[in-house]
């Protein structure tokens, strides 16, 4: 059994992931951490009778040993959580977004220094990861590309981590093949109307109630367009990816960014 603890256990994502960890036959949830729900019964919060667990306020209150920590909190809390876990020499799976490059570089160093492993993934939906992998093949033939990402109106950051990762991967692929994206726009009548830009790739963010998490990658060519789109219809779509990450990270050492790091394990 892989003994696991969960930071942000009582948040919207945390409740979904917590239930999945409890239901998994090879994973044991030994700690639910969420300072806003400290002292409450976790089984009542997520609606299950398969476990009896009191919500803890911090990692310092944990008495059980564990193998992997999972974090779905916010960037500020995750930064502290990740440092503590890596310094303990434990492995970590992180779904929290908004982490800066400076933070990520620090995590890389800590993972190596403490002979442990960490995966940070902007998106755990397998469909979203495959969308990016497909787009990586398409951009070689259609270098004129833009990204539209759409999320619920409670999402705090824009653009999404998935959109940024997509643009980074596509931009790297374009550079590898000496390709460029042409944009003739010289004047924005409304500032920002062409979206944000990562290298030559424009990213457009939409925030509306009723949305969950969606992304469309649009490629344009002579007389044609090609779109690749992923729609997350509920938070349950992230469960298979999170479980895969936990099962894989236990075998690894070092730093990994993006769930595709583990999808390609057979080629590694």
Curated annotation (Swiss-Prot):
Its main location: cytoplasm. Pathway: Amino-acid biosynthesis; L-lysine biosynthesis via DAP pathway; (S)-tetrahydrodipicolinate from L-aspartate: step 4/4. (S)-2,3,4,5-tetrahydrodipicolinate binds at residues 152, 161-162. It is an enzyme of class 1 (oxidoreductase). It is found in: Cytoplasm. GO terms for biological process: diaminopimelate biosynthetic process; lysine biosynthetic process via diaminopimelate. GO terms for molecular function: 4-hydroxy-tetrahydrodipicolinate reductase; NAD binding; NADP binding; oxidoreductase activity, acting on CH or CH2 groups, NAD or NADP as acceptor. Keywords: Amino-acid biosynthesis, Cytoplasm, Diaminopimelate biosynthesis, Lysine biosynthesis, NAD, NADP, Oxidoreductase. PANTHER family: 4-HYDROXY-TETRAHYDRODIPICOLINATE REDUCTASE 1, CHLOROPLASTIC-RELATED, DIHYDRODIPICOLINATE REDUCTASE. This is 4-hydroxy-tetrahydrodipicolinate reductase.
